[in-house]
Amino acid sequence: MAAPAPSLISVFSSPQELGASLAQLVAQRAASCLEGDRGRFALGLSGGSLVSMLARDLPAAAAPAGPASFARWTLGFCDERLVPFDHAESTYGLYRTHLLSKLPIPDSQVLTINPALPVEDAAEDYARKLRQALQGDAVPVFDLLILGVGPDGHTCSLFPDHPLLQEREKIVAPISDSPKPPPQRVTLTLPVLNAAQSIIFVATGEGKAAVLKRILEDKEGTLPAALVQPRTGALCWFLDEAAARLLSVPFEKHSTL
């Protein structure tokens, strides 16, 4: 089943239907990129509920392309907690367990932090890996970033009123005072987010409704998620009905049934 063409805001009746359409869209984007001039697909993932959502639906959605296609995928992470990979808070660790065991992406194509390094060094090391893997642009360009948004409006590990929102030189930044535990993390910065070819924000549940109204309807442009405005790429929001319940702005209602 083909995913719906994304509008600015797409609303689904349940997280399950959202996840199925998201997986189809990732697979379609991958196929398009692999047929393009660069012949590769660079995907940036966020953690949280996205892990289980993608683990459930992406392997089947991407399977028709065949195992060989995954050798040309490059997978990165939009932010990461500075914890060992077997820690429950490790975003890579969760994807390794639940998704990467089902997708034959070579380990060399999965870009991770080195959690044994101090946070500043871990950020620099991850930035080097990104530049090496995504060569050809002054700022590394992902073909697709999948982002979440917190009830406070944060995305990645970019939090409201934090100095990292002003970072323009680094492509990956360390953070040692995260308002959410664990405190030490590394995160992509706004210049990298806004260089992406496509960005999908995913939000589900009533707990996200108020902040989505602030971003999408009240246009509170200082919230971190609102600062994600791709320079030339596409931006869309995938929401379930609970997350969208306070919105009166136009959106497209989708169903995979």
From Swiss-Prot:
It is found in: Cytoplasm. Pathway: Carbohydrate degradation; pentose phosphate pathway; D-ribulose 5-phosphate from D-glucose 6-phosphate (oxidative stage): step 2/3. One of its GO terms (molecular function) is 6-phosphogluconolactonase activity. Keywords: Acetylation, Cytoplasm, Hydrolase, Phosphoprotein. Its EC number is 3.1.1.31. Pfam families: Glucosamine_iso. Its main location: cytoplasm. GO terms for cellular component: cytoplasm. InterPro entries: 6-phosphogluconolactonase_DevB, Glc/Gal-6P_isomerase, NagB/RpiA_transferase-like, PGLS. It is an enzyme of class 3 (hydrolase). Gene3D superfamilies: 3.40.50.1360. One of its GO terms (biological process) is pentose-phosphate shunt, oxidative branch. The modification N-acetylalanine is found at residue 2. CDD domains: 6PGL (cd01400). The modification N6-acetyllysine is found at residue 180. The modification Phosphoserine is found at residue 49. It catalyses: 6-phospho-D-glucono-1,5-lactone + H2O = 6-phospho-D-gluconate + H(+). Hydrolysis of 6-phosphogluconolactone to 6-phosphogluconate. Belongs to the glucosamine/galactosamine-6-phosphate isomerase family. 6-phosphogluconolactonase subfamily. PANTHER family: 6-PHOSPHOGLUCONOLACTONASE. This is 6-phosphogluconolactonase. The lineage of its organism: Eukaryota, Metazoa, Chordata, Craniata, Vertebrata.
